[in-house]
């Protein structure tokens, strides 16, 4: 079995986790939105690329829309996915150029750029395990998209305090988390075992931390911590005990960072910004700490990818908002996008209501 064959499992895991963490009345729309984003990304990636390139491009496009759920239209999902798929292709080419920058001899006319060339040769970390072109890019995009889309209706009270909107199907989200774990083998099989250690230690840490913080364990935060630990573990590439420590830190930081975003009216029910945006930085920080890489190496790579995704999302979001197609109509969102847009609910046998 080719490693690229695991990527669809990772994509399915992300879709299921988002659908499970969202509202019941928008679960179908969330799933369809994810399929649209994945499909657009795969088609763009397939232009002049291999099947693995197409799947990586589709995964990046999908992850960029995770967390938005039923807050955006299918048009928005398609446009955002197309923009990030193109950004992914550009970032892959840029990474290859920067990674080889130290091997090129600059002509005399460009001699003034020699310090920049030397700086890139030292501090640019190549895109291993698609850490920049997929994960960090998607994390930055998700942050920008969540800020442009705004919170779900009713998520915050008039005094600014967040109102509880519990995940409607945590078992579905849990299945999604396990599929993310299995599918992550596609990014780097040699790093997957260490990443597994980080992921499960992050899961347990998040359960314990939420128990201490809230008085009850919170599975939704635990799944976010699991995802963060998985990506941080892939990014760190360290041995067993350091991977264990990376997971512990990732489990705490994922919860704390998601809560911090919530206080700033960034409604991220999946924790995608922590899992895909912050976790790669935690991974390379672990490399610095345990001497696997020199201090500072990789932070430029991470920053470029996150910034590229963030700017792309803000620009596309502003354009879509200007045309009035960014979000569904408030009446559709309140009544449920499944019924209003598709004429059928994900759970027709149950009464759908807000928790």
Residue map of PLM features:
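Hydrophobic alpha-helical transmembrane bundles of multi-pass membrane proteins
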Residues: 1-355
């Amino acid at each position: 079995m080719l490693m690229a064959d695991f990527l669809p499992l990772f994509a399915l895991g992300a879709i299921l986790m988002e659908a499970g963490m969202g509202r019941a009345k928008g679960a179908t729309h969330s799933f369809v939105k994810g399929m649209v984003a994945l499909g657009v990304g795969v088609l763009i990636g397939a232009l002049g690329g291999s099947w693995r390139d197409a799947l990586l491009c589709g995964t990046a496009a999908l992850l960029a829309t995770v967390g938005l759920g039923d807050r955006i239209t299918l048009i928005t999902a398609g446009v955002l996915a197309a923009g990030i798929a193109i950004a992914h292709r550009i970032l892959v080419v840029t990474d290859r150029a920067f990674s080889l920058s130290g091997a090129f001899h600059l002509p005399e006319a460009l001699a003034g750029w020699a310090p920049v060339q030397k700086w890139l040769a030292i501090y640019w970390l190549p895109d291993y395990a698609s850490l920049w072109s997929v994960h960090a890019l998607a994390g930055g995009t998700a942050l920008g998209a969540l800020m442009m889309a705004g919170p779900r209706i009713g998520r915050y009270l008039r005094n600014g305090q967040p109102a509880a909107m519990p995940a409607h199907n945590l078992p579905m989200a849990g299945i999604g988390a396990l599929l993310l774990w299995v599918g992550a083998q596609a990014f780097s099989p040699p790093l997957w075992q260490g990443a597994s250690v980080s992921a499960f230690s992050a899961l347990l840490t998040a359960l314990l931390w939420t128990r201490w913080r809230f008085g009850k364990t919170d599975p939704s935060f635990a799944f976010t911590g699991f995802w963060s630990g998985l990506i941080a573990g892939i990014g760190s590439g360290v041995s067993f005990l350091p991977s264990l420590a990376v997971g512990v830190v990732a489990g705490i930081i994922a919860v704390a960072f998601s809560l911090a975003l919530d206080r700033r009216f960034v409604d991220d029910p999946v924790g995608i910004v922590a899992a895909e945006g912050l976790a790669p930085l935690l991974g390379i920080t672990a490399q610095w700490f345990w001497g696997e890489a020199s201090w500072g190496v990789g932070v430029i790579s991470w920053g470029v990818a996150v910034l590229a995704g963030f700017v792309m999302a803000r620009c596309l979001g502003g354009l879509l908002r200007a045309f009035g197609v960014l979000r569904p109509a408030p009446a559709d969102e309140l009544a449920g996008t499944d019924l209003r847009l598709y004429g059928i609910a994900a759970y027709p046998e149950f009464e759908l209501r807000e928790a």
